[in-house]
Amino acid sequence: MPRADEVDLTDYLKELPVGTVVQVVNTQTGEIVTGTTLTPVDDTIPQNTEGVECMTLAITPTNASNKLLIQVVANSSHSASNPTYTVALFQDNTVNALAAIASFNSDASAGRPLSRILNHFMTAGTTNLTTFKVRIGANVGGTLTFNGIAGARYYGGVMASSITITEIKA
């Protein structure tokens, strides 16, 4: 009897109906990341040099035509008052973001943490290993803290951010 890692699932995957979940990969982290690189809030596509890289997750799609649903939950705070945060999603070494969201911290006090959610749906386009990266930046000077406040962890590491990638048969 072959081991599970020796079984070729190619024929089985071809028989799945459209819309079936083929695989799910996930990373969740409570790790603290800090940085000071700004992300402008303007009408340009965020670049892979802006903000701070906070999380990455790799997937090897089973079919280039399949769809990928990428779901990001990102917790962060900033040392400045009233920052506008940008959360941007990148793939491999591509310079331009695939998707981005902005959120404004309307509380006048610095350091208030916010959770942001970004969802992106796309065609896989490859059957090679591909890595998705999340970068977060603010539009004002100061220090961004990912998963905490003022460079410190909160809630014992369970204030966690995540990336989940679901491959869906096309």
Residue ranges and their predicted role:
Residues M55-I59:
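Extended, low-complexity regulatory regions
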Residues M1-L38:
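Glycine-rich, low-complexity segments
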Residues T37-T44, P61-A170:
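Terminal beta-strand-rich extracellular "head" domains
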Residues G51-E53:
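Short, solvent-exposed loop/turn segments enriched in Ser/Thr/Gly
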